[in-house]
Amino acid sequence: MKLWGGRFKEEESKLMEDFNSSLSFDKKLYYEDIKGSIAHVKMLANQNIIKEEEKEKILLGLEEILKEIDEGILKIEGDYEDIHSFVEINLINKIGNVGKKLHTGRSRNDQVALDMKLYAKKSTEEVIECLKELMDSLIKVGNENNYIMPGYTHLQRAQVVTFRYHLLAYFEMFKRDEKRLENALEFLNESPLGSGALAGSTYNIDREYTAKLLGFRKPVDNFLDGVSDRDYIIELISKFSIIMMHLSRLSEELILWSSSEFRFIQIGDAYSTGSSIMPQKKNPDGAELIRGKIGRVYGDLISILTVMKSLPLAYNKDMQEDKEPFFDAKDTVISCLKVMEGIISTLKVNKENLMKSVKKGFLNATEAADYLVNKGMAFRDAHKVIGEVVIYCEDKNSAIEDLSLEELKQFSDLFCEDIYEFIDYKNSINKGIKKEMGYF
């Protein structure tokens, strides 16, 4: 049974049936579809478009279908065009011809737009919750490991930071991601139900009532816009892409830090794998997969942008292709956030190796230049002097703080005994605005 066909003389080909069907993926929307239908039926009865007893029969049937799907009794499968057809046809089979009144005053165009809005709202809230859990772990692990470590530019040791402060940089990125998603919820807060195919309905539909029942702030202002745009899907996948970019950057650093060349951290066994041939290997596959999966989400964004490009108003079948990219992007970002939270919460930090790396990198060179500036030298001159000191140290395989005062005075008479206190790593990180890094 199809929900259309009266004007056709010939049957749809099996090839076209299979090509046209979206049930294999839009079955994810069954909950939203049924909840939308429940609100629609209540509104129809309130507006005296259907009888009260008809409403009760339809509601009972819809609730039974939802329960049977949730319990695995009713499988979402078969030769149905989409999830809307599946629900409506099963409703008619369950309660009889009264089920045919479900679709009164409604099109699949506003129906699917509603389903996607509801699903997108729920998905956004799920991603926000995953972000919060990851941010909590970043703070907790950072506070537990507030050790001095090298900060990098160009992947070269640059200045001293702390492990905690480094993790907090990612906290700030994810905090902005959370804010972006919270802002996006505003655009998801308008209900398209009642827009019909594109031009509303001749029935006295109460769109405000259904919008309130379904948790929306208001109905959409324009019927055409309500059924024909998916900019909110594009926006969400764009925001998911930014989250994935941040996750990928963090993954790359965790991969580097866990390598034998760095040995700053050890990723837990629960988020690592081994080699089928090399017994000694412990591979950071969780982080590597997160880094790799960014391509999927970027691809999903390009896919939906391409689908919507140049589409005339209102609904076009092209828009059926909005679902798989969104479902994939949402599932991917959630799984990556959960795995990253697991990696962060179980990693071990090697305090000694962090400090060894600090001492090897002349990370107090800037502070040494600042010392000379405090003694009256112009910064550019101080920069040159300390550069020469670094060359001298490299030739001697020594650190700046290990040079004698006599050696330092070869470069400037401004050096005094207090240089050693000034360039001490633990002291310097608590000087000036650096105190904001919160080393304790």
Swiss-Prot record:
Top-level division of the source organism's lineage: Bacteria
InterPro entries found in the cross-reference section: Arg_succ_lyase_C (IPR029419), Argininosuccinate_lyase (IPR009049), Fumarase/histidase_N (IPR024083), Fumarate_lyase_CS (IPR020557), Fumarate_lyase_fam (IPR000362), Fumarate_lyase_N (IPR022761), L-Aspartase-like (IPR008948)
Source species: Clostridium botulinum (strain 657 / Type Ba4)
UniProt key word Amino-acid biosynthesis: yes
Cellular compartment(s): Cytoplasm
Protein name (record): Argininosuccinate lyase
Pfam families tied to this protein: ASL_C2 (PF14698), Lyase_1 (PF00206)
Major location category of this protein: cytoplasm
Keyword set, alphabetical order: Amino-acid biosynthesis, Arginine biosynthesis, Cytoplasm, Lyase
Entry's EC annotation: 4.3.2.1
Family: Belongs to the lyase 1 family. Argininosuccinate lyase subfamily.
A GO biological process held by the record: L-arginine biosynthetic process
GO molecular function, one term: argininosuccinate lyase activity
PROSITE patterns: FUMARATE_LYASES
CDD domains per the UniProt record, alphabetical: Argininosuccinate_lyase
